[in-house]
């Protein structure tokens, strides 16, 4: 599962999920992509589940690019703990995803297989998604 090797600080504020994605919203590497339509936190487990679904369906063919990385630590307090006594310890990592963000890209496989693989991965995501195809101009710029 994905997680940072080291961070400057162990804990982070939760933050807000406002606005749309201004970066990472265009196809850069592959021909087909899975794009988020809602804001959410996507955990490293969910990212890995989606990656496995795509690679298993594609069966060695083509290449997959994961365009998100879980760099936000989420802390959890122990069960039945009284109020106070500080913030909990980091439990898992999430990626903050805004609408328009590309989650996965796939290239080197036929469109039917790519669409089916992306659909399986989309079921594993906590957000509504859409499958987009790179235009010929975008393919030239790669």
From Swiss-Prot:
Coiled coil: none annotated. The keyword Chloroplast applies. GO terms for molecular function: rRNA binding; structural constituent of ribosome. It is found in: Plastid, Chloroplast. InterPro entries: Ribosomal_uL16, Ribosomal_uL16_bact-type, Ribosomal_uL16_CS, Ribosomal_uL16_dom, Ribosomal_uL16_sf. The keyword Flavoprotein does not apply. GO terms for cellular component: chloroplast; mitochondrial large ribosomal subunit. GO terms for biological process: mitochondrial translation. Its main location: plastid. Keywords: Chloroplast, Plastid, Ribonucleoprotein, Ribosomal protein. Part of the 50S ribosomal subunit. Belongs to the universal ribosomal protein uL16 family. This is Large ribosomal subunit protein uL16c. The gene is rpl16.
